[in-house]
Amino acid sequence: MRRGSSESELAARWEAEAVAAAKAAAKAEAEATAETVAEQVRVDAGAAGEPECKAGEEQPKVLAPAPAQPSAAEEGNTQVLQRPPPTLPPSKPKPVQGLCPHGKPRDKGRSCKRSSGHGSGENGSQRPVTVDSSKARTSLDALKISIRQLKWKEFPFGRRLPCDIYWHGVSFHDNDIFSGQVNKFPGMTEMVRKITLSRAVRTMQNLFPEEYNFYPRSWILPDEFQLFVAQVQMVKDDDPSWKPTFIVKPDGGCQGDGIYLIKDPSDIRLAGTLQSRPAVVQEYICKPLLIDKLKFDIRLYVLLKSLDPLEIYIAKDGLSRFCTEPYQEPTPKNLHRIFMHLTNYSLNIHSGNFIHSDSASTGSKRTFSSILCRLSSKGVDIKKVWSDIISVVIKTVIALTPELKVFYQSDIPTGRPGPTCFQILGFDILLMKNLKPILLEVNANPSMRIEHEHELSPGVFENVPSLVDEEVKVAVIRDTLRLMDPLKKKRENQSQQLEKPFAGKEDALDGELTSAPDCNANPEAHLPSICLKQVFPKYAKQFNYLRLVDRMANLFIRFLGIKGTMKLGPTGFRTFIRSCKLSSSSLSMAAVDILYIDITRRWNSMTLDQRDSGMCLQAFVEAFFFLAQRKFKMLPLHEQVASLIDLCEYHLSLLDEKRLVCGRGVPSGGRPPHRGPPQEPSPSAQPAGDNPPPRTSCANKLSHPRHTLS
């Protein structure tokens, strides 16, 4: 009896377990049918190999729906029991279309902040800033150290998800990016080429000759070769004792490549090279400041943080690069001695006299601060030296920004998604014997290497860390990243909210905050003070009067018409003339067309870029100068130009107000308010026709006291 009873109980128990297994299988099938493919466990963290599971855990697998298992009673076999299928990972409800998995509206082209690592961490701590260093090239070592010091997260091989910051080694176009921040401006490489820089500075020299006398007089070859010969001969005829020296620099050259000195224009190497490789010839600075009887220059690092509004920072320290032969004024016998005349590091490192030193104040490469200390010990006014250098940097950037704006709107048109930009520039400055700073050139990609090559044996080299380079360059990169930190403002806003009364209750309702961050935790507490000093807009009041070409660029961009183009067509130029009411009985529209054709044809023949037809910005500036000189004949050029800009801006503001009224209706008070007409400068400057007289507050603009920039 017991045995039969136990067998029947066992069979009943097996049957009950089989029924339970069938029910579990049916439930699993229902869940699998509702969600055809199980949700992926984690979003792919990208090519950098971000871990998707905690250490020691097994990666969950995506399982296909399991077929329902029949019960033992249905099969007629109570002896063979099949186990229920393994349990699927717990599934999350599908997000509503247009919303992210957390119920937030989706941003077009952007992932959910939490799922992509853009929200707060699971433990309530702020997520680290992410940096894509896959295109960093020679600056990679210094960048890695900077990221490590900041405790940010580096992606050395890129990432599928967007990063906060992209670090490019060459240009803006190293990567195709549509969000975040990138350390290059579009067009910067083209703008600091020697010919383009010389033209930009020359435009400013025409307007403000005394303010821009820090750049040597330059001629562009081959276009201005005959002009160069004629002007040199004219000066020699007036002063037979004048024995100049000139330096020839290839337009696209770098690291001293192709540079040579001449005493006479006939010494220029014309044989085929200038046509394929244009160049700039400049007056050579024959009386530089010497230290230890050696010529040297200064590499200063300048951060262009923003283009509009303009923000400029200068590093408090830089590098001083020395020649390796004692300096002598140039003569026909020593013109070829490059180690005496050229300060380029890439040239002098091959000299047998080059001295590598870990000390900041000795060797062939030293810190600029050590040079200032040495000058200060001799009684030199260091504040005056710094003030003059800051002035050179600001004025140079003001000369570059107009055309940079045109490049920027071409690559990142207004209203379209795109990254924001910043860039570290290398300014090469020479101090003359009287301590006046002279701008030699600007580098879009200054070397950020922190090691040098050491020759172990003939032809065998190894890379050795350079403590001087590391001291200066790591600080520049690290503090640039600190200034560009995209989460800094968010942290500050959160701290301010938590300091308010009852802020805790409001934060509890905020879905973005999983827990309150520690207000007292300063992520930069362990870092030294920032080595970058803001100089603009800090000193904007002293330099804004120079930004005339910048205002012309705004007019130029307004009438471009097609987004993404960089040249103004004939229709756009006519529209500019009509909108600003510049045509008159003495300047017909036919004359305007001829002006456009003549200037555009000449500038297109001088530039190598023939991708687009039309009027470039420099051609527009020349046409604008011509119109200003016709309209305001009794004023200096900079006042003529300022008056015409004021007139154009006045008429365009009226046009904008008229469009606003047509779109929204006239306010109940009657006529819409607008700026009054500009004040009349003098009867001779009265515009023709019914045009209101322009404002000419240039006297006030130019009467700025010359403060020391500390």
Curated annotation (Swiss-Prot):
An annotated Gene Ontology molecular function: tubulin binding
GO cellular component assignments: ciliary basal body; cytosol; microtubule
Binding, ATP: K249, Q255, G256, Q282, E283, Y284, I285, K295, F296, D297, T343, N344
Binding of L-glutamate, residues: R321, Y345, S346, K365, K473
Domain of life: Eukaryota
Positions with a binding annotation for Mg(2+) 2: E441, N443
Entries under PROSITE patterns matching the protein: TTL (PS51221)
Keyword S-adenosyl-L-methionine appears in the UniProt entry: no
Pfam families given in the database record: TTL (PF03133)
Region (Disordered): 41-135, 665-710
UniProt feature, compositional bias: Pro residues: 83-93
This enzyme's EC code(s): 6.3.2.-
Cell compartments where the protein resides: Cytoplasm, Cytoskeleton, Cilium basal body; Cytoplasm, Cytoskeleton
Annotated InterPro entries: TTL/TTLL_fam
Free-text note on domains in this protein's UniProt record: The flexible c-MTBD (cationic microtubule binding domain) region mediates binding to microtubules. It is positively charged and becomes ordered when bound to microtubules: it interacts with a negatively charged patch on tubulin. The presence of positive charges in the c-MTBD region is essential for proper binding. A glutamine residue at this position is found in elongases TTLL6, TTLL9, TTLL11, TTLL13, TTLL10 and favors glutamate-chain elongation, whereas an arginine residue is found in initiases TTLL2, TTLL4, TTLL5, TTLL3, TTLL8 and favors initiation.
Name of protein: Tubulin polyglutamylase TTLL11
Organism: Homo sapiens (Human)
